[in-house]
């Protein structure tokens, strides 16, 4: 298996609301998608939104028992602490729950956590040891 992730799909309660959240708050643009799912192209990785029940059915399970803590966090790295703060400034008015306000992190960066309207946990982070290329790709080396 090659070392990459091609698609990350989140189960959501309200597809229209979830798509609007990622478009308005995060600033992503949805791609042309089949009915009932929304895709965003993110520099080689596709990010998808699909209703909980449909995703569970596709996985051969049910969507019962979705808990608040799911044992993961998705992360979006930005180019400055100010950019972290700007994103957090928009979150609450669009249905996000702030889990941890942005602050200096033990690893030398600056980050905060929120959950989107469907409870998916996100970290918005500035890592001074990584470089974000012009096209948005992240390099784990400072250039």
Tell me what each language-model feature is.
Residues 1-17, 71-76, 128-143:
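N-terminal beta-strand motif that seeds the catalytic metal site of vicinal oxygen chelate
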Residues 9-56:
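Core segments of cupin and vicinal oxygen chelate
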Residues 12-16, 74-117:
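Vicinal oxygen chelate
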Residues 54, 106-107, 128-131:
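A short acidic/small-residue loop/turn micro-motif
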Residues 55-61, 131-134:
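A short, acidic/glycine-rich surface segment
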């Amino acid at each position: 298996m090659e070392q990459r992730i091609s698609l990350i799909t989140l189960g959501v309660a309200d597809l229209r609301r979830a798509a609007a959240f990622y478009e308005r708050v995060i600033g992503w643009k949805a791609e042309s998608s089949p009915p009932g799912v929304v895709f965003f192209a993110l520099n080689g990785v596709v990010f998808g939104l699909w209703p909980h029940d449909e995703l569970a059915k596709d996985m051969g399970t049910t969507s019962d028992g979705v808990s608040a803590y799911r044992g993961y966090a998705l992360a979006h790295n930005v180019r400055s602490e100010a950019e972290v703060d700007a994103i957090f400034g928009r979150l609450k008015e669009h249905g996000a729950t702030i889990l941890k306000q942005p602050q200096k992190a033990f690893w030398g960066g600056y980050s905060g956590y929120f959950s989107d309207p469907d409870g998916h946990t996100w970290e918005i982070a500035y890592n001074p040891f990584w470089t974000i290329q012009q096209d948005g790709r992240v390099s784990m080396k400072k250039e």
